[in-house]
Amino acid sequence: MAPAKWLIASLAFASTGLAFTPEDFISAPRRGEAIPDPKGQFAVFPVSKYNFDTKDRPSGWNLLNLKTGDISVLTTDADVSEITWLGEGTNLLYVNGTDSVKGGVGIWISDAKNFGNAYKAGSIPGAFQGFKLAKSGDKINFVGYGQSTTKGDLYNEAAIEKPVSSARIYDSLFVRHWDAYVGTQFNAVFSGALTKNGNKYSFDGKLKNLVQPVKYAESPYPPFGGSGDYDLSPDGKTVAFMSKAPELPKANLTTSYIFTVPHDGSKVAEPINKRNGPRTPHGIEGASSSPVFSPDSKRIAYLQMATKNYESDRRVIHIAEVGSNKPAQRIASNWDRSPESIKWSSDGRTLYVTAEEHATGKLFTLPSDARDNHMPSAVKHDGSVSAFSFVGSSKSVLITGNSLWSNALYQIATPGRPNRKLFYANEHDPQLKGLGPNDIEPLWVDGARTKIHSWIVKPTGFDKNKVYPLAFLIHGGPQGSWGDNWSTRWNPRVWADQGYVVIAPNPTGSTGFGQKLTDDITNDWGGAPYKDLFKIWEHVRDNLKYVDTDNGIAAGASFGGFMINWIQGQELGRKFKALVSHDGTFVGSSKIGTDELFFIEHDFNGTFFEARQNYDRWDCSKPEYVAKWSTPQLVVHSDYDFRLSVAEGVGLFNVLQEKGVPSRLLNFPDESHCVTKPENSLVWHQQVLGWINKFSGINKSNPKAIKLSDCKVEVIDHEAGSYFDY
């Protein structure tokens, strides 16, 4: 399409301005999981909102009326870090981060109807979170987690004497994981009890470490483990937790077990699904997750993968009897989806599970005794499910969800019935005003081997008779997806409202479309996925007349960053006006510097020294590829990214500069694989969007679009003969 035609069309669109800006995106309220009270009348959830003027993020807790959808403020005390229902009417337990014990937290008891009238039940001498409660006689037993010292005590950073040397000494892996160097402390689940004295509960300060007696065990497992890694039985007597297999090398294998242990720690925890154990189905030795007790406390449901070094293998539901030596039962094992979380119905007959299907996080139900060929039934709801809880003892669940068009969707869902909307953020928050599902639609295109899904995200005020440049966004993983959910980092709506039509493809390797598509990227990073992307681009060029591919851009992070680097040296790289590579691999042999070796050893069919040819096969730095580089490229890489060393980004930038390709490096010394700090996020958006807008022509047609000059961070340029005028 001729640039002049696009320019006229864009000028017509430019008069609408920018509907959803990075400032709106970053400052919009962020709400967490809504958890209902035992009777299903109210739900409590956290909320925070970044303020660009004061440079802080005030936080608090709200109450959601489950009948009316009305929201009221429970507390604006930012020191309240956690709230959970006590299990008695509207009574609450909350954690206060300020305490008389330096570095510790306080446990407080209150009532949702009069939150200010609270009393302190006790102190915990260290950071502690993830409370789960269960009645046990006249006590309330609880579990939660914090960090443990090697002796098994709760770690308190404020009480630790600073060492005189900064040296670290390692005899095994991990050395560093995700964004931090591994130290001697580790996560552990602790148990305790609240004792009732008259009308009040008190805590005696005694905690039992349930994990430390198992040498080399850790739960929740970092970097993303949380309260979903453990559970407390409804009778309060037994605790289940997930840990990586203590006897196996954690950086090389994904194998993990579900352990059970008495709440009082009177016995050492034992695994119920140990590799090659009598209770473990034959051949099952992968990652375990999401242990949850049945209502009668007699069974545990959990998820487990089969393969021992593959983090994206298909999860299968298992059910084991507590205290029995019988083998665990596999439930609906032929279902070609990968469940992510489980809950039991109040009668124990039905399982509610979440799983991704066709780029949407859905809720499903199935009998707890379902046979292998049973296909779970989907429950109707909007958007994607991020969490859910039962409303009282009914079959209805309160869903906390989100979508591409709203960052918070609270709704009631009941199997066999339409969902009932309670609160949708895009209908209330001024920052999200105008966002909705009408600007988003799926696209299916014949790919390299099968039909491939993409999302089309259109700008606010979209007019099908006008033309918009293409923003081609490639997701990470590679075993991931662009789902119908809200991203707090790469948000397609922010890109679209600069004046683009966003195409967000789910090529080979993506999750939620059957395990085969996910598996097919193994040892084929630059093969089928690249062909899929090229075919999608061609389909958009030939069939979507409102998309200008001549002035399009492409961007990606993580695996998407690798793919951008790969595209730069391929034919598709010449189809774009600008590229953005965020934390992408560049040199094939550099992958050995990553943290989780099981990832590369699975995806490249062997170790770095035994299958070197596979690592070199998709090496973006090969001279024959670099010789083709010419498309302007922004490189983003941060210092705390230990998945992919910052040297990858610097090396990529070095070559771009020496090749004379218009390029810029954006580095954050205090960020990791993702840029999460609000002010850094704003700079990221100003640089990334400013970069693509400059080369796509948006800056010329729409004066309100972001420019590189909008960023107030000074550019470092020591080259007197700089060839490129920014």
From Swiss-Prot:
Subcellular location(s) per record: Secreted
Name of the protein this chain belongs to: Dipeptidyl-peptidase 5
Region of interest called Disordered, as start-end residue ranges on this chain: 268-292
Organism, as annotated: Arthroderma otae
InterPro entries: 6-blade_b-propeller_TolB-like, AB_hydrolase_fold, PD40, Peptidase_S9_cat
Active site per the UniProt annotation: S558 (charge relay system), D641 (charge relay system), H673 (charge relay system)
Keywords assigned by UniProt, alphabetized: Aminopeptidase, Glycoprotein, Hydrolase, Protease, Secreted, Serine protease, Signal, Virulence
Pfam families found in the cross-reference section: PD40, Peptidase_S9
Signal peptide (UniProt feature, chain positions): 1-19
GO function terms (MF aspect): aminopeptidase activity; serine-type endopeptidase activity
